Amino acid sequence: MGTLVLQAPNRHNIIMPSGLIPLFPLRVVVFPRTPLPLHIFEERYKEMVGGAIRDQSEFGIVLAHESGIGNAGCTVKVEKLLQMYPDGRMDILTRGQRRFDIVTVNDEKDYLQAEVSFFDDDDAAASPDLRAQAVLRYKELAALPVSQAFGEPDMFDRQLSFQLAQSLPDLDFLSSLLRARSEDARLKQLNHYLSEYIPRQRTIERMKSLAPTNGFGGKPAGL
């Protein structure tokens, strides 16, 4: 067992010291400061999470694909142990911490570990107009019947885009936001995405409401 080298990280903007962290591949994208509840049932992840709770340390969430894992992710810390089961399974609440690029993956333990390079945004302030537009579209999103929006956003968060995007279902899109080093760039991506996503969802909801009818808002003849 050894070390698998992944694609080299994109080294620009603010780069922070690297380190070795445990990895938890999942079909989910988590952002800094956003909550992520998890049910832990595999033995290897019981060990990993148990160590994180004991040491109050972080582990990395990376997007799992059929062909492997993404080359960027976000660490989380266990904020609360919600339930411990007799067989060692756990329900936990975690919260996103720091973003990272994967430099190398190490498989010497039962769970993956990786040498990572942490990064953050550049220091440029986000455009107030972009923020206002994104918040407006977020409120339109929250008004949809199928919305899973997370309540009122914290307008003082310098990375507001993460809050506004966390309930969206498109994991590839969320992964692209996670990797972006500019809040302006994320807000532009988010505004463009929502400008297409919201009308599409409205159309879907309207079609669902018409499905039991004859297409004109009334019941078919004979029913």
Regions found by a protein language model. Give the residues of each.
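N-terminal low-complexity, acidic/polar interaction/targeting segments
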Residues: N10-L223
